[in-house]
């Protein structure tokens, strides 16, 4: 019975739960790796060994957090749980494919971990650039295993994307138009389109790298008429949409949380929000070379990518100000979920501002591969994506489990996390402006102070992670059941009870106008 339910599941709620548990577990691994990085950088001198080991840890940290924490939780966890409930569908369009999408991830994770245990590990950075990732600089199976890991994770995401697009387009009740679906449903659909269009390009790039390494092709080797810059174009054509894939479902969740705890029946500027997400999705595909300003692009190419990148600030601004307008004049309930959402809006905006700085190709020449870039993307990921996940988790936890979290503990958890991540990443802006480069395990003494502060901050964040485990335990141990849910008419996922029945609908639902 246990095996039938959890291994062969075709139920969107169970698969969503599996994704959430897998993502939480991977998040622990990713956090452990990040703490190893901060321990190494906590003082000058060597702690763990040479830079190969250090870079293996950095590479694994990136892959684990992106492919096994953020994406499984946001798209697999929240997406599977909420999308069918929000559109009134009995399940996903392809329930068995849904199961396969999940079960491709543990083997993928296993391959990634295996890559670090054989030979010297894949110390390439998450970008896996040749010639460093070639078979001379990285002899042995490590990079090959990492490539296979990415293949599996990519197939998983592509299948999931097909499933979500089909579900959202085809499984709405006849009376529900696309422009009446909740914003989270929109965000997942746009994310799925981005995945569908960008992942095949990554697959092509890493497959060519695989044949360069093992079959003597020369796609990325100038000696045989290849070009390593081609790899960078292929990688970043995936890599830039990927960062929007990581944040867009977060946008959707934040819209729901802000609307709910402002006591509003709908978000401010629904159509503007949809338009903004579609614009961000489209623009995300035509700005990739801003990651490559230092490789010798033509000056007019640099001018184009600078301008195009800055255009993304417009739809992003539409979203930020619409969230603020939703809050405006609302009957605000200061719940932990709203605190996460407010933290998201503030810190994501800071990250966006440093992004505008880096979009300038002339400035990026100086700041590229320094800690300024690390600070920038950790503000939008560690305080954007993660805050959205945490906000979504504490908001929908009663829906998933039927139990409520302890309000005070949850607020304390938010406060500790807020202090921790800011203390970790704010000083890194200063390090970057002073020229401290990324991906080095050691640094000159001049950088010591800010690194010490940053490392202390990382251990404050660790405290928050441990506290979160306690808070979840406390909720299950105390078993405070949900009494009432407000605003159910505009938040239909709550309409079916907390938690909803295993099969939401025994027969198709039709909404009469």
From Swiss-Prot:
One BP annotation, GO: mitochondrial electron transport, cytochrome c to oxygen
UniProt cofactor note: Binds 2 heme A groups non-covalently per subunit. Binds a copper B center.
Residue positions binding Na(+): 40, 45, 441
Binding residues annotated for O2, in chain numbering: 244
Cellular localisation: Mitochondrion inner membrane
InterPro entries: Cyt_c_oxase-like_su1_dom (IPR023616), Cyt_c_oxase-like_su1_sf (IPR036927), Cyt_C_Oxase_1 (IPR000883), Cyt_c_Oxase_su1_BS (IPR023615), Cyt_c_oxase_su1_dom (IPR033944)
UniProt binding sites for heme a3: 376
Catalytic activity: 4 Fe(II)-[cytochrome c] + O2 + 8 H(+)(in) = 4 Fe(III)-[cytochrome c] + 2 H2O + 4 H(+)(out)
GO molecular function list: cytochrome-c oxidase activity; heme binding; metal ion binding
This protein's UniProt keywords: Calcium, Copper, Electron transport, Heme, Iron, Magnesium, Membrane, Metal-binding, Mitochondrion, Mitochondrion inner membrane, Respiratory chain, Sodium, Translocase, Transmembrane, Transmembrane helix, Transport
GO annotation, cellular component aspect: mitochondrial inner membrane; respiratory chain complex IV
TM spans (from-to): 12-40, 51-86, 95-117, 141-170, 183-212, 228-261, 270-286, 299-327, 336-357, 371-400, 407-433, 447-478
Topological region Mitochondrial matrix: 1-11, 87-94, 171-182, 262-269, 328-335, 401-406, 479-513
Family: Belongs to the heme-copper respiratory oxidase family.
Function recorded in the entry: Component of the cytochrome c oxidase, the last enzyme in the mitochondrial electron transport chain which drives oxidative phosphorylation. The respiratory chain contains 3 multisubunit complexes succinate dehydrogenase (complex II, CII), ubiquinol-cytochrome c oxidoreductase (cytochrome b-c1 complex, complex III, CIII) and cytochrome c oxidase (complex IV, CIV), that cooperate to transfer electrons derived from NADH and succinate to molecular oxygen, creating an electrochemical gradient over the inner membrane that drives transmembrane transport and the ATP synthase.
The name this protein goes by in its record: Cytochrome c oxidase subunit 1
Species in which this protein is naturally found: Osphranter robustus
The gene coding this protein: MT-CO1
């Amino acid at each position: 019975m246990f095996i039938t339910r959890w291994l062969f599941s075709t139920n969107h709620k169970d698969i969503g739960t599996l994704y959430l548990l897998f993502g939480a577990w991977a998040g622990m691994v990713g956090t452990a790796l990040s703490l190893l990085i901060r321990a190494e950088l906590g003082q000058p001198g060597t702690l763990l060994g040479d830079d190969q080991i250090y870079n293996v840890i950095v590479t694994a940290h990136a892959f684990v957090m992106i492919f096994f924490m953020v994406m499984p939780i946001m798209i697999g966890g929240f997406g599977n749980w909420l999308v069918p409930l929000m559109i009134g569908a009995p399940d996903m369009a392809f329930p068995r494919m849904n199961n396969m999408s999940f079960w491709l991830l543990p083997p993928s994770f296993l391959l990634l971990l295996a890559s670090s245990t054989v030979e010297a590990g894949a110390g390439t950075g998450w970008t896996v650039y040749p010639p460093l990732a070639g078979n001379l600089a990285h002899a042995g199976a490590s990079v090959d295993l990492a490539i296979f890991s990415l293949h599996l994770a990519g197939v998983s995401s592509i299948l999931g994307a097909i499933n979500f697009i089909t579900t959202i387009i085809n499984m709405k009740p006849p009376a529900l138009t696309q422009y009446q679906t909740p914003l989270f449903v929109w965000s997942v659909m746009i994310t799925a389109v981005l995945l569908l269009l960008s992942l095949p390009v990554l697959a092509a790039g890493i497959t060519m790298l695989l044949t360069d390494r093992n079959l003597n092709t020369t796609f990325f080797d100038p000696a045989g008429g290849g070009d390593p810059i081609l790899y960078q174009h292929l990688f970043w054509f995936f890599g830039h949409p990927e960062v929007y894939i990581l944040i867009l479902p977060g946008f959707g969740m934040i819209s729901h949380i802000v609307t709910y705890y402002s006591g509003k029946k709908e978000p401010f500027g629904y159509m503007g929000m949809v338009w903004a997400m579609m614009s961000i999705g489209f623009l995300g595909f035509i700005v990739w070379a801003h990651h490559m300003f230092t490789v010798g692009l033509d000056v007019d190419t640099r001018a184009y990518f600078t301008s195009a990148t800055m255009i993304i600030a417009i739809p992003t601004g539409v979203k930020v100000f619409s969230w603020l307008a939703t809050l405006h004049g609302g009957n605000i309930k200061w719940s932990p979920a709203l605190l996460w959402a407010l933290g998201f809006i503030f810190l994501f905006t800071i990250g966006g501002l440093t992004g505008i700085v880096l979009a300038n190709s002339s400035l990026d020449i100086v700041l590229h591969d320094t800690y300024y870039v690390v600070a920038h993307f950790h503000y939008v990921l560690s305080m954007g994506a993660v805050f959205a996940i945490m906000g979504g988790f504490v908001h929908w936890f009663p829906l998933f489990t039927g139990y409520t979290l302890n309000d005070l503990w949850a607020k304390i958890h938010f406060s500790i996390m807020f202090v921790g991540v800011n203390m970790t990443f704010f000083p890194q802006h200063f390090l970057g402006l002073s020229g401290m480069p990324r991906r080095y395990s050691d640094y000159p003494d001049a950088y010591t102070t800010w690194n010490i502060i940053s490392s202390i901050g990382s251990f404050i964040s660790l405290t928050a992670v441990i506290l979160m485990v306690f808070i979840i335990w406390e909720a299950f141990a105390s078993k405070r059941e949900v009494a009432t849910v407000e605003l159910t008419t505009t938040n239909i996922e709550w309409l079916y009870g907390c938690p909803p029945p295993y099969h939401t609908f025994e027969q198709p639902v039709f909404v009469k106008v």
